[in-house]
């Protein structure tokens, strides 16, 4: 028999499964220097497009549409099934046409954090809010560090408390530097015991020059 622990709802859960930008709205985008690249709407969390190469510039724009294909089962599915990687690459091509710029060969480093909360944490609004605060502070540190193209996190499911959060980076080195901030390091230590289990998955997206094809592969 599966014991169901109802996940506590918090304000930070709002709108997580709604994309920042829908694929159909690409024609409405304008040339801008900063974009929202995470669930956080405050401007200090926005991504500075001026720091990016052409390939990563197009990728970051495409990732504004990034949400799971299945908002219920995403945390239980393999990454490439949970998210539509082909659609992201297709949008890279669309942005290339829109801005009349060639797509160079480039790659991105992706991290997925899969976790299952302890039942007493899962049902506690205070505990979930604390985790959300650590996430937000860690994102700001990583954004200042540079190279973080996208951050998205979901909501622990009611049955298992299982969840998935993911980051897209320009490189593995950017991810290493971005995860070295004080809030991130100390936050992990403070809440390590709040998880029944967790694991890290690593992936790479390699886009071929011109964007005609791509390779998405696991690194771990």
Curated annotation (Swiss-Prot):
The keyword Cell membrane does not apply. Keywords: Cytoplasm, Nucleus. It is found in: Cytoplasm; Nucleus. The keyword Nucleus applies. It comes from the Eukaryota. Its main location: cytoplasm. GO terms for cellular component: cytosol; nucleus. Belongs to the UPF0643 family. This is UPF0643 protein PB2B2.08. It comes from Schizosaccharomyces pombe (strain 972 / ATCC 24843) (Fission yeast).
């Amino acid at each position: 028999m599966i014991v169901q622990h109802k996940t506590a709802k918090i304000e930070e859960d709002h709108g997580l499964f709604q994309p920042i930008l829908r694929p159909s709205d690409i024609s409405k985008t304008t040339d801008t220097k900063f974009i929202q690249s995470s669930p956080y709407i405050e401007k200090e969390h926005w991504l500075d497009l001026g720091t990016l190469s052409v390939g990563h510039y197009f990728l970051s724009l495409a990732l504004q549409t990034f949400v799971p294909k299945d908002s219920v089962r995403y945390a239980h599915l393999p990454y490439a099934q949970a998210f539509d990687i082909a659609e992201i690459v297709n949008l890279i091509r669309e942005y290339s046409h829109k801005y009349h710029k060639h797509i160079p060969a480039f790659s991105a480093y992706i991290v997925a954090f899969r976790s299952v909360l302890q039942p007493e944490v899962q049902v506690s609004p205070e505990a979930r809010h604390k985790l959300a605060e650590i996430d937000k502070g860690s994102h700001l540190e990583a954004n200042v560090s540079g190279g973080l193209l996208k951050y998205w996190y979901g909501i622990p499911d009611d049955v298992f408390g299982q969840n998935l959060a993911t980051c897209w980076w320009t490189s593995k080195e950017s991810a290493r530097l971005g995860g070295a901030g004080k809030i991130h390091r100390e936050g992990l230590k403070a809440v390590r015991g709040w998880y029944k289990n967790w694991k890290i998955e690593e992936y790479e997206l390699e886009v071929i020059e011109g964007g005609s094809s791509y390779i998405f592969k696991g690194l771990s």
